[in-house]
Amino acid sequence: MRYQITSDSTCDLSPELLQRYNIRLLPLYVNMDGKTLRDGLDVRPDDIYAHVSAGGGLPKTAAVNLADYVRMFTELSAQNDFVIHICISLDFSCCYQNARLAAADFDNVYVVDSRNLSTGHGLVVLEAERMARAGMAPDEIVAALQELTGRVEASFILDRLDYMKMGGRCSAVTLLGANLLKLRPCIEVKDGKMGVGKKYRGSFEKCLVQYITDKIGARSDLELRRVFITHSGLPEETVQKAVETVQKLQPFDEICVTRAGCTVSSHCGPGTIGVLYIRKAEA
């Protein structure tokens, strides 16, 4: 059967992975300086950082609109036996509602809420492609993905909280305390929502190693097919330290290093990195 897996740009999959697995993306929008820009096409995270550093304020992100979805589904549904679109969590954006509305006019278009963001969302996209390539029927894929979303573990550790403060996600007092005490909070996605997990103290590299160890060390319940290390713009040596730490702790078949897109970057700012993976299904 001919199929097409599609997603929103918030999945943060690299161009190489998109090409390898023939994933089609629709960009979210970033409103900056009175202009509406397409995530990953007209604007990139470094543009946002430069804009904020210049005193321009934090840009706002906006969902893929209904017309964009209708246009893509019209094209792809005619070319394929089925299309499966995976969205960023309903709790982060109205992409899912818009995609569902657009898909209602097509018998062979299916929409799935990833219940995640960034490469937590991306992991669901790649699993959808793997299932479709294996010959599963679209109804079976959708059911399998809905079960899978509860097993994706996505988290990030932040080196700085100024972007969280600008976005109204932490207070000035919290920011001051974190800076004084050298606290690096872990942001976790649970049940489709973002929350604060453990707080680490010390140098960023020390906290990074401890964070990764806490997440994947001494565990036998992880699917080892793939892990993502996703960051919002960090020095190569810091990213490599994360890779080496993961390699020491778990024998993943594939370690994918990716840059976070505009959504995560505008929420968390530079100096953010996470490990994202899937738990095994319970027996």
Regions found by a protein language model. Name each.
Residues 4, 10-24, 28-31, 82, ...:
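Mixed-charge interfacial surface used for oligomerization/domain docking
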Residues 55-57, 63-90, 97-98, 142, ...:
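Glycine-rich phosphate- or other oxyanion-binding loops that anchor nucleotides, phosphorylated ligands
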Residues 4-65:
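N-terminal glycine-rich anion-binding loop in soluble enzyme alpha/beta folds
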Residues 63, 114-115:
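Short beta->alpha junction loops
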